[in-house]
């Protein structure tokens, strides 16, 4: 038999991967917290198998979600005060060798935006969408470093994309 805190620590080992750290164990519960901004992923099938073991649980954010440094990713706990070690061994076997959770850092750092449309290009209407795109990019740690206006002319748009690619931005967005 194991105390709930020891059991929670074993569950943490099942789930934790790099780019995250644990909270202190308290009353049989540990939380995992993101160390970086990135994409949070959960092996949902193996998590289901682990959670099928009685008297333990691991709750996570949804898989494939953007997270920020400091966000809580998961909480795990042993439900009774003491737990049969065989249940934790069963959970460890269900989890396999790889951790259940992963935070992958964002790889894209810079973006260029090409705003298309003859009305915007000629100044007949104001471009109100580019600031929205820029804010959305910033939420993922991506800086918009280039912005180009193009008419609806296909050759002009094609040339703008080629120029943007040559400039070395990580991401090109056409609106």
Locate predicted features:
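Extended, charged alpha/beta regions that create polyanion-binding interfaces
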Residues: 2-106
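Noncatalytic linker/hinge segments flanking ATPase motor cores
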Residues: 63-65, 71-79, 116, 147-159
């Amino acid at each position: 038999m194991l105390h709930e805190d020891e059991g929670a620590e074993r569950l943490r080992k099942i789930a934790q991967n790099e780019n995250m750290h644990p909270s202190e164990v308290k009353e049989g519960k540990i939380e995992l917290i993101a160390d970086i901004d990135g994409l949070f992923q959960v092996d949902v099938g193996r998590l289901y198998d682990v959670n099928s073991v009685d008297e333990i649980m691991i709750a996570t954010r949804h898989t494939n979600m953007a997270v920020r440094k400091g966000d809580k990713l998961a909480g795990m706990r042993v439900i009774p005060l003491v737990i049969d070690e065989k249940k934790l061994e069963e959970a460890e076997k269900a989890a396999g060798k790889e951790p259940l959770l992963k935070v992958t850092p964002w790889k894209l750092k810079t973006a260029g935006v090409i705003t298309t449309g003859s009305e915007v290009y000629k100044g007949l209407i104001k471009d109100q969408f580019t600031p929205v795109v820029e804010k959305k990019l910033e939420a993922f740690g991506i800086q918009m470093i280039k912005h180009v206006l193009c008419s609806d002319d296909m050759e002009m748009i094609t040339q703008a994309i080629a120029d943007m690619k040559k400039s070395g931005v990580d991401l090109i967005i056409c609106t």
